[in-house]
C-alpha cells in the first residue's frame, strides 16, 4: 500500500518577542540536565509508536527519518525536514504529499477550519461536495511549520458534508470517514461532546477507542492535557517529532478528519512532569517557543484575551466551552495559577455565557481528594479556586460542569460547598489506560461518583436543551462500548442557591 494511502493540526502564530533570558544558576542548570535525561529516546519512541497496533513498515521508516532530522538540534523545524535529502527521496518514492491532517477544528455557526501539514511548501484547498468552488488556496510555508489552515464557510446546520483536500491541485488520500457534520441549531436538538485526557501518545493509536468516539457522532472532542508530546522540555524539534508520531496513527487520522478537536495542555505537553511557568534553567523565550509549536500543531479558535498561554472560549451546539491554561502562567506566587489576566478573562466569560450548560476545563483536578491536590489547585492556589467557585455562586451562574485530568484513571466527584450547593467534577484521564493513584477511598464514599484504573475510557456529555429544565447526561464509556457510569443532571441541580442558602 503506498504510504500516501497509509497516511490516510489551529492557526499558526509567529513567534512572540520574548524577554532577555536570565543567566541560569548552576543549580538550575543541573536540575534542567537531570530532567532532560528523562526525555524518551528513539527506542522508547518506536515502542510507543507500535504499542497498541503495529505500524506499517513505511510509516516506521518515515518516523525514523523524520525523528533523526528533528532531534538533531533543539530548534529543528519541519522546514529543515523538508530540505533533508533522505526525506525528499522517501516522499518521492512513496508519493507522499502531506504529513498530517486533515484535522477539523474551530467550529463556527456556518463552518469549520481544516488543518493540513504538507511535506514541503504548497498550496492547500478544500473541496466540499455540493459547493461550486473549493475553499482556499492557503499556502503552507516554512514560517507556518508547513501548516495550512483552510476556513470552510457557508455550511448549513444539521448537515453532513463529505470533502476532499487538494495539495498543489492534486487530491490527497483521505481517511474513509472524512466528513464535516455541522451541529443542529434546532432548540430541541441533542448534542454530544466527547472529552478526556492522558492518551500519552500511545492512546492516540487505539483504533477501537477512536472508532467508538467517532461512531457516537459527537459534535466535538475536547482533549485537555498529556495528549501527543511526552516530556520534551525546550527541545522544539522533539516536540515536532511527537506531533508527527500523532499523525502517524491511522486511528487518530480517522477520528479528527470527521470530529472537530479542541485542546489545551498539561505538564507533559508543556515541558515535563509537574513543570509549569518558567521551569528552573529555562527562559521566558523557551516558554513562548513551546507555546508556538503547540499552537501550530492544533486548530483552536484563538487565545483568550491576548497572545499569552493557550486558553479560550467557544460554543459547541448549545454548550459554552471554556478551556483554561493551568500551566503557562504559574510563578509560585499566590494567585498565579491562572494569572491575573486569565482570571479576569474567565470571570467575564462566565457572566457572558448564554447556553444552558458551561463546560469548564482544568488540566489538573479541581478537587483535592486524589493525591491531596498535588501539582494542582489545592497545593498551588486554593485561594484562586475559591475565588472561581465563590464567583459562580455569587452570580448564580447555572449549568457549570467541571472537567479535569492529570491523575491517570478516571474519577468523578461532588465538591460540596458551605452553601449546600455542590459542584460536579468529571475526570476521564483514561485515554491511555495508564495506571495512576488510587481510584477510590472509604473517605470519599459520600462524594465520589465513580473510579477506574488501567483501562481505556472516555467521557461524554449528551445535552438535551428541550425540557423546560434542560438536562445533561454524563457517560464514562470504555473502548469496548460499555457504559461504565452514567449520571443525568438537570440545569436546576447545577444552579447555585440564592444568598440566604446555608443560613
What are these regions (language model features)?
Residues 11-14, 201:
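General secretory precursor processing signal
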Residues 2-12:
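Bacterial N-terminal signal peptides
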Residues 26-503:
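Metal-dependent phosphoester/phosphodiester hydrolase catalytic core
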Residues 9, 16, 26-28:
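A general, composition-driven signal for non-globular sequence regions
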Residues 13-21:
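Boundary at the C-terminal end of the N-terminal hydrophobic targeting segment
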